């Protein structure tokens, strides 16, 4: 789909298969990686698909050489997972802005920040997945990254905002974020979160490019650890496979010396 959109956006869109050459692919990959501000991994995923397509064209005689040859993947060792934490002052600005401009997008931000639910998983949440009495949110295995059901604790701010937005007045089988971020029967991809963040939040609040919608998840984990919530609780809420993953988020400025080791004494 992005390839079709990119081609349509060109001053002279390609029409014939011979125009699908290495120069065109290079420019498309740069568009995905640089202009759309995607990760190196996303860039590699697109290139991998293009390699398969190029192989198909060669196999069936549409071209006389594999046009992706010479375009390399970015090595995994060169891909560093960037975790950008949004500052407290910017979190306040974000909250104040969305309270007046778009409470439903603020709700999506709260779910990402407090429940650590990935954007794609958020897009599949239905009204009936919330258990207000128990204070939990159910994520179904069909849509989670590890393909397991998950029951997460809901922060009171999420419930209060859902009531304020009238979310619980909709049928339980409605998606929480359908067209226009309003509950509805139609599934909408997580792209609408990224688009709103890029075109409205980042633009109007003048956030740096390093601030992405997904940054709220990393910021939420770090904020909980900074608030001295124990690592086990944070690990379970974030669904980390190991406490070692959670420890990566621990801010260095709150790490404290172990008093037992400080006072440890021997004959040496």
Where would I find each of the regions flagged by the language model?
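Short, basic (Lys/Arg/His-rich) helix/loop patches that form interaction surfaces
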Residues: 96, 152, 168-172, 194-236
